[in-house]
Design a protein with these regions (language model features):
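Flexible, glycine-rich phosphate/dinucleotide-binding loops
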Residues: 36-37, 66, 136, 158, ...
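Alpha-helix initiation/capping motif
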Residues: 40, 104, 131-132, 141, ...
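Hydrophobic anchor at the start of a short beta-strand
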Residues: 57, 126-127, 149
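Substrate-binding cleft of extracellular glycoside hydrolase catalytic domains
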Residues: 1-22, 26-122
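Aromatic-lined carbohydrate-recognition surfaces of secreted/lumenal glycan-active proteins
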Residues: 124-137
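Structural recognition of alpha->loop->beta junctions
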Residues: 75-97, 139-165
Length: 190
């Protein structure tokens, strides 16, 4: 996979962006927010760091079934600056153990359509959907919302999405210079 990069959150810790870029990371997706209640405390520093290292960079929102789409979009829009150089935004869809509600598919698709429209309007470009296998199995998002897909699967290319994927988190535990601990390593389909 010739184009590879990383996903970071405040949980990743401090990142040495120049070192990370030298290790082969072409791009970075940086978590801006989780749901409507958490603004990632390292978002601004990571955004500046990735840009300063000459990497392509984009913002990610971790979707929550426990918050309204409008509130999550507001959190994203007040955190992420409008930036024509930024990569398309990504909305991560997975189950959060601290959020127990599991609404029906129609309600989830309705909320996601609202969220996608608001995030895309702010970013000025179509969003990617990073869908976990269990979330897609329950809600069949890949069939319900026509957006570029990003899937997850350690080491082996996943086949759970009903449409071809464009991005894949190939490892959520890669160790690389420039980061203490593990990092999510992402690849783009050739």
């Amino acid at each position: 996979y010739p184009t590879q990069g990383v996903s970071v959150t405040s949980d990743t810790g401090l990142v040495e962006w120049g070192t990370l870029a030298a290790q082969g990371a072409d791009f970075a997706y940086i978590r801006a927010a989780r749901g409507a209640s958490l603004r990632d405390p390292l978002f601004a520093a990571n955004w500046r760091g990735a840009r300063g290292a000459g990497m392509r960079y984009g913002a990610a929102l971790d979707y929550s079934l426990c918050a309204k789409a409008v509130d999550q979009a507001t959190q994203f829009m007040t955190t992420v600056p409008r930036d024509n150089a930024a990569l398309p935004p990504v909305i991560r869809l997975g189950f959060d153990p601290s959020c127990s509600p599991r609404p029906g598919r129609d309600q989830v698709l309705s909320e996601l359509n609202t969220l996608v429209n608001l995030v895309e309007s702010h970013a000025g470009k179509p969003a990617l959907l990073n869908i976990s296998a269990d979330f897609d199995a329950q809600y069949d998002i890949a069939s319900g919302i026509n957006r570029t897909l990003w899937v997850d699967g350690n080491f082996f290319a996943p086949d759970y999405a009903k449409r071809p994927w464009v991005m894949w988190t190939a490892s959520d535990m890669r160790h690389i210079d420039g980061v203490d601990g593990s990092i999510r390593w992402d690849v783009v389909a050739p």
